[in-house]
């Protein structure tokens, strides 16, 4: 938990997964502070009623974008949006190095976790199809290689790297790409934008409000399949999210590498 004190107002920044502890946190903080606010985010198109009830314990909930704010307002949560977000990489102000694109050797980059929401399995499956018999490369910087399709055109990096090394990957790539099903802040988009890289993704949810140009992948709003969602996240992933249309996304990537 991160906390910020302004006068008699306390604001905590906490991930939505910790909502079962919010009531105790608020009760303890109200012994010392007149106002207790929460800064958080969520990645789907709705919020579970149990989490809404916990949010209403705070005086105000602060979220990154209007898309999230509007959902909470419909549930009666007092809320405001920053319409801004950043990352430690961006805050470090790394040097942006211009790269001249080689159309015969394009480099695509995904930076993020490998889990059911991020949908990296579909991402690597698409690129294994599209990049076969080419010299183009997809770099996947992630936490684990589980169930990923790996070919000579797909490089998976799972070790921890510094912000300086991560900046080198962004400077090396020609495009940033993700097949994520849901997103609360859009870090890949914001970091790609910082490095002047085109972003390939769907355009749903918060992505509509990031202020970055997106090469759109076709997608559909779908019910969440909880088969591979850990038990502690089943209330966190609530409502619907967005699934990439795999066959039509293959066509989009093929068009990019043929231009």
Task: Please describe what each predicted stretch is.
Residues 1-12:
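Single conserved hydrophobic/aromatic residue that forms the stacking wall/gate
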């Amino acid at each position: 938990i991160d906390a910020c004190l302004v006068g008699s107002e306390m604001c905590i920044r906490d991930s939505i997964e910790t909502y079962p502890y919010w009531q105790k946190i608020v009760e303890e903080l109200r012994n010392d502070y007149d106002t207790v606010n929460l800064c958080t985010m969520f990645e789907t198109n709705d919020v579970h009623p149990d989490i809404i009830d916990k949010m209403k314990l705070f005086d105000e909930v602060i979220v990154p974008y209007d898309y999230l704010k509007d959902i909470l307002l419909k549930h009666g949560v007092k809320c405001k949006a920053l319409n801004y977000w950043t990352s430690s990489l961006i805050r470090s102000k790394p040097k942006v190095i211009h790269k001249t694109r080689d159309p015969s050797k394009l480099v695509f980059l995904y930076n993020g976790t490998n889990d059911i929401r991020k949908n990296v399995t579909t991402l690597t499956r698409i690129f294994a199809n599209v990049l076969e018999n080419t010299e183009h490369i997809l770099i996947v910087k992630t936490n684990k290689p589980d169930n990923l399709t790996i070919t000579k055109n797909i490089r998976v990096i799972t070790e921890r790297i510094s912000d300086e090394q991560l900046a080198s990957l962004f400077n090396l790539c020609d495009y940033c790409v993700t097949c994520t099903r849901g997103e609360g802040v859009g870090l890949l988009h914001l970091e790609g934008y910082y490095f002047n890289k085109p972003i390939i993704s769907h355009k749903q949810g918060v992505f509509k409000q990031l202020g970055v140009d997106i090469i759109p992948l076709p997608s559909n709003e779908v019910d969440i399949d909880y088969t591979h969602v850990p038990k502690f996240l089943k209330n966190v992933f609530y409502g619907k999210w967005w699934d990439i249309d795999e066959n039509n996304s293959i066509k989009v990537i093929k068009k990019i590498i043929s231009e």
